[in-house]
Regions:
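General "foldedness" signal
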Residues: 28-33, 63, 130, 142-146, ...
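Midchain, well-structured core segments that form catalytic/ion-binding scaffolds
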Residues: 1-133
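An extended, acidic, His-containing surface patch that forms the Zn2+-binding/catalytic region
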Residues: 70-115, 120-123, 137-142, 157-207
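C-terminal, non-catalytic macromolecule-binding modules
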Residues: 129-155
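Generic non-transmembrane alpha-helical segments
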Residues: 3-11, 48-59, 146-154, 174, ...
């Protein structure tokens, strides 16, 4: 969504009225919407939007063939509630540059990641909720410090809530030994044992 807004604001004519996306902090958001005010030519804005929409459909034709970018016009005047053009650019900067995705890998597997789960504007303030994940408590803490540094650097206030528990590899596991032996007895070969970066409930069950 932020890339869409940046594209449409190439002439600095866009002002953000409101933005909303996602409903869970640990889920990659599938939909988002923004209400904007343009101070430029409406017909030209529509043309630029169509060009941008076609570009993104080409870019994500294989990865997301069902992608939809919809533009709806409204006759309601919301000039008074719109964020300034510089403020709109700042929101776009924050959403496009905030740490996101895989942050650290080891032995071919992901060990540290985060996602932007929810975002919304309320009373001209931007609220973003991120889900942090790490295989160890230290990895989660480092990630929290990094995100906090970014938020403070962009004029925001970080609020670190309860984190999902980490799920470090347990090298001495009676259950793993039993499952490995059962697999070897059944198939005559040793199983490939991996630590995956997923299933947050695993950490909750351990605790």
């Amino acid at each position: 969504l932020e890339d869409t807004m940046l594209y449409l604001d190439s002439a600095d004519t866009l002002r953000l009225v409101g933005i909303r996306g996602g409903d869970k902090d640990n889920v990659i958001t599938k939909t988002a919407q923004a209400e904007v005010l343009t101070t430029g030519n409406g017909a030209q804005f529509q043309e630029v939007f169509e060009q941008m929409s076609a570009m993104y459909r080409r870019m994500y034709a294989d990865a997301d063939p069902g992608m939809k970018i919809v533009l709806e016009k409204t006759a309601v005047n919301k000039t008074e509630s719109a964020i300034s053009s510089p403020g709109t650019r700042k929101v776009c900067f924050i959403l496009s540059q905030i740490p996101y995705g895989v942050q650290y890998m080891e032995k071919g597997g992901v060990r540290q990641s985060l996602n932007l789960g929810k975002v919304e504007t309320t009373d001209k303030a931007l609220t973003a909720v991120l889900g942090l994940r790490g295989n160890t408590p230290d990895q989660i803490q480092v990630l929290a410090d990094r995100v906090s540094c970014f938020i403070v650097g962009t004029g925001g206030t970080p609020d670190i809530g309860d984190a999902y528990p980490s799920w470090p590899e347990k090298k001495n596991s009676a259950l793993l030994d039993m499952m490995t032996k059962s697999y070897e007895d059944e198939y005559g070969i040793s199983p490939e044992v991996l630590v995956i970066h997923g299933g947050l409930e695993c950490g909750l069950i351990i605790e």
